[in-house]
Amino acid sequence: MATTRLIPLHTGKGRKFGKAIRNVIGYVSNPKKTHQGELVTGFGCNPETADGEFLLMKREYIARTGRRRGKDDVIAYHLRQSFVPGEITPEEANRIGCELAKRFTHGQHAYVVATHEDRRHVHSHIIFSAVNLDCDRKFRDFFRERTSTGQTERYTVRGKRAVDH
């Protein structure tokens, strides 16, 4: 089973939206960690320009809805998925990461999946835009709501075991 963690990303600490997204996508897409970029996949965006595309979606969302949040605004989400060492190839992990992202967002949000092979355990980072592809809605984090009420379930991913942290 794989462990998966969802982390909301905020601008915070004086950073602008574009810089915050550029920093996180730059980190997860690092060629040294992703087999020279071969383990980076995008949906609804080009991984090389995803930061700019996420920014355009955010601006379009504000223009369409008139909704603007402050510093606490969630600009994107970061899913981390880790596997037990030796149990999965980086290519399989990337494919499973893409499947998870598609299921998690219902194919409605642009995302970048970057699989790292620089540690003992293979792990994927999934960054997806908080704004949907139609730029008229934002992702609602029902998973975190269920977690806080103790209603989460353990999901297995193709029989893979969890990494102990």
Predicted regions and their residues:
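N-terminal nicking endonuclease/strand-transfer module with a His-rich metal-binding environment
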Residues: 1-165
